[in-house]
Curated annotation (Swiss-Prot):
Organism: Mannheimia succiniciproducens (strain KCTC 0769BP / MBEL55E)
Gene: hemH
Binding residue positions for Fe cation: 195, 276
UniProt record, GO biological process: heme biosynthetic process
Taxonomy, superkingdom: Bacteria
Pathway: Porphyrin-containing compound metabolism; protoheme biosynthesis; protoheme from protoporphyrin-IX: step 1/1
GO annotations of cellular component type: cytoplasm
Keywords assigned: Cytoplasm, Heme biosynthesis, Iron, Lyase, Metal-binding, Porphyrin biosynthesis
Protein name as catalogued: Ferrochelatase
Length: 323
């Protein structure tokens, strides 16, 4: 009897091909043109994006990308490649017939490329794993959109399963707890920083915030932290309309006034370190905190390719392996 072959799609946001302004502009154009990300009327948004935002922003952040770039490419891409390799080993050790592809919602390797490869290798089922523990209409939903679009090229739609979120997955919570325990000092305040979304999106039905809160609550409960020992904030706001609050940078400006002078920050919504964690949180926000009276600040890395994270993702997928 022929054993079934499962295709696994590891989906993440994406990254520029190089840290050059041209490549960054090309990537940002694809990303910020998605109505799931910015839902303003096209006639209003696209001229603003193409005429002002892309020329200015791509040049401005090229230096930031250059500072974190590695020989393997962007950190997000390099780490996702490691996750793929380690997950392949995970399934080989369990004698599972699995093919894993990486598909980015924006940029390369594209979702289309990943799907075409899986179907060409005649997989019997595809499991789509968006590498976002907390669901958002700005991240998880675009994965579904692009995945569905990629299937349009094929006459036969392979049976598939789409993992919606895993914000309370036991292995995910335990991986966060272990990572924090080995890095958090007794006298440090713990800040959970999640990527923000416009407040309006929440009002329109995006339930991202409750999932972020549930993740943080589950972690602090296992850590035994009191309410005055931690806080949840939202980072990376963009544009002029209100986003989810409290804002990470604004909290850091006032933390010392509240008696918080030693701080560690973790970003549980990121499955791999990237520009927002390595530059914004680790470097830029550290400067803010210290400038406003903070004494010590350090960033707790994303789960990345840690053994606990690979076990978390592997077991999450293993549960869905049967057709």
């Amino acid at each position: 009897m022929k054993s079934s072959k499962t295709g696994i799609l590891l989906a993440n946001l994406g990254t520029p091909d190089t840290p050059s302004p041209k490549a960054i502009s090309r990537y940002l154009k694809e990303f910020l043109s998605d109505p799931r990300v910015v839902d303003l009327p096209r006639w209003k948004w696209l001229p603003l994006l193409n005429g002002i935002i892309l020329p200015i922003r791509s040049r401005r952040i090229a230096k930031n990308y250059g500072a974190i770039w590695t020989e393997q490419g962007s950190p997000l891409f390099a780490i996702t490649q490691k996750q793929k390799a380690l997950l392949t080993e995970f399934f080989q050790q369990r004698q599972q017939n699995v093919i894993i592809e990486i598909g980015m919602t924006y940029g390369n390797p594209s979702m289309q490329y990943a799907i075409d490869n899986l179907i060409e290798q005649k997989v019997d089922k595809i499991i789509v794993l968006p590498l976002y523990p907390q669901y958002s209409s700005t991240t998880t939903a675009p994965v579904f959109d692009v995945f569905a679009q990629a299937l349009k090229r094929h006459r036969h739609i392979v049976p598939f399963e789409f993992i919606h979120s895993y914000h309370l997955d036991e292995n995910y919570i335990e991986a966060l707890v272990k990572s924090i325990k080995v890095r958090l000092k007794n006298d440090e305040f713990l800040l959970f920083s999640f990527h923000g979304i416009p407040k309006r999106y929440e009002q329109e039905g995006d339930f991202y915030r409750p999932q972020c809160e549930q993740t943080a609550q589950a972690v602090v409960q296992k850590l035994g932290l009191k309410k005055e020992q931690w806080r949840l904030c939202f980072q990376s706001r963009f544009g002029s309309e209100p986003w989810l609050q409290p804002y990470t940078d604004k909290f850091l400006e006032t933390a010392a006034q509240q008696g918080i002078t030693k701080l560690a920050v973790i970003c549980p919504g990121f499955s791999a370190d990237c520009l927002e964690t390595l530059e914004e949180i680790k470097e830029e926000n550290k400067r803010i905190f210290l400038a406003y009276g903070g004494e010590s600040y350090h960033y707790i890395p994303a789960l990345n390719d840690s053994p606990e994270h690979i076990a978390c993702l592997g077991n999450l997928l293993l549960k869905r392996m049967t057709i």
